[in-house]
């Protein structure tokens, strides 16, 4: 609810939420906003976005509190990373899917792969990974992961790649940990990146 803020002269952004700078300060000097009432910079599009998540609110609140107390913290933005569980399956997403990327002016290429989260002799379970990248720059734009195990780590890896503006080539070459009880020799996210590269070359 932003009615109180709007009534007090605080500027609302293009998303309808409260517009803030990287210090979480509103258009009214000395007044800060954070959480579900405030918009944030989207790290992929570079534009304001409204993605009300607990993790985002927590990070925003820490920056707003520090800056209100005279600190110099900065909120760098969001990728919209989220996860949920339905039964035994976890579903996670970060960044832009292909249709969203197209609407934002990118020329997206996307791929989905189905793999095992462990080698078979360690009772590997099915997992699926999708990645989206821009055809011109090869920059990763987003992705999603589903499966029974390992989903949080894989989606967080993709989110980190978005935050650092990695290309698919960079992502595919990451030096990730491997031992049979924990993962396959080629992690499913890198298998997906390798398949995506075939669409970009």
Language-model features: locations:
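Active-site-proximal substrate-binding core of FAD-dependent oxidoreductases
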Residues: 47-51, 67-94, 174-178
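FAD-site-proximal beta/loop scaffold in flavoenzymes
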Residues: 1-63, 157, 161
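Flexible, glycine-rich terminal cap/loop adjacent to redox cofactors
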Residues: 88-91, 102-201
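Short, amphipathic alpha-helical "lid/cap" segments that border enzyme active or binding sites
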Residues: 57-65, 69, 189, 193
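N-terminal glycine-rich dinucleotide-binding loop that anchors FAD/FMN and/or NAD(P) in oxidoreductases
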Residues: 96-98
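A short alpha-helix-loop-beta-strand transition element characteristic
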Residues: 11-15, 71-82, 107-111
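Residue-level structural signal for beta-strand termini and adjacent loop
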Residues: 32, 69, 145-146
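Solvent-exposed alpha-helices and their adjacent loops that cap or buttress functional pockets
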Residues: 24-26, 76, 123-124, 133
């Amino acid at each position: 609810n932003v009615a109180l803020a709007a009534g007090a002269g605080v500027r609302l952004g293009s998303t309808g939420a409260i517009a803030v700078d990287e210090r979480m300060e509103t258009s009214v000097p000395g007044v800060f906003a954070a959480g579900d009432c405030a918009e944030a910079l989207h790290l992929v599009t570079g534009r304001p976005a409204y993605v009300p998540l607990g993790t985002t609110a927590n990070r925003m609140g820490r920056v707003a509190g520090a800056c209100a107390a005279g600190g110099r913290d900065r909120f760098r933005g969001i990728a919209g990373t989220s996860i949920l569980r339905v039964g035994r399956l976890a579903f996670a997403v970060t960044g832009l899917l292909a249709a969203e990327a197209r609407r934002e002016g990118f020329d997206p290429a996307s791929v989905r792969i189905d793999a095992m989260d462990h080698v078979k002799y360690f009772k590997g379970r099915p997992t699926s990974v999708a990645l989206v990248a821009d055809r011109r720059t090869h920059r990763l734009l987003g992705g999603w992961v589903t499966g029974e195990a390992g989903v949080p780590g894989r989606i967080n890896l993709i989110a980190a790649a978005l935050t650092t503006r990695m290309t698919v080539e960079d992502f595919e070459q990451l030096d990730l940990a491997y031992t049979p009880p924990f993962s396959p020799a080629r992690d499913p996210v890198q298998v997906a990146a390798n398949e995506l590269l075939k669409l970009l070359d």
